């Protein structure tokens, strides 16, 4: 799993490109995102965990989404970063642990995986 952070446009572009590359390699890709960007992605599974700024909804849905991806044998997961304040900090901590602290800075890397 990789958490992608940065400006929304750069994050979406990076996840879209990385998803295409992984799917061409035969990977089954899942994406965790906000409701507002859900329609921007094409992957095997795209799950919106809530609206931007609604960290409570993200916290409530995150575990179910991760379990769902696991049961579907998703081999590669990309997640948009969430705000790191309040409940959002707990969501980000869980995402970072699941990602093994693998973070991609969309703008700095041109969307290339670190």
Regions found by a protein language model. Give the residues of each.
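A C-terminal functional module that forms or caps the active site or interfaces directly
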Residues: 2-100
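A glycine-rich helix N-cap at a beta->alpha junction
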Residues: 97-114
């Amino acid at each position: 799993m990789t958490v992608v952070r940065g400006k929304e446009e750069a994050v979406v572009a990076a996840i879209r490109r990385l998803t295409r590359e992984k799917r061409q390699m035969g990977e089954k890709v899942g994406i965790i995102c906000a409701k507002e960007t859900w329609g921007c992605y094409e992957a095997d599974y795209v799950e919106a965990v809530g609206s931007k700024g609604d960290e409570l909804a993200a916290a409530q849905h995150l575990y179910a989404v991760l379990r769902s991806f696991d049961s579907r044998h998703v081999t590669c997961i990309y997640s948009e970063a969430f705000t790191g304040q309040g409940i959002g900090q707990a969501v980000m901590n869980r995402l970072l642990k699941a990602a093994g602290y693998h973070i991609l800075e969309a703008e700095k890397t041109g969307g290339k995986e670190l």
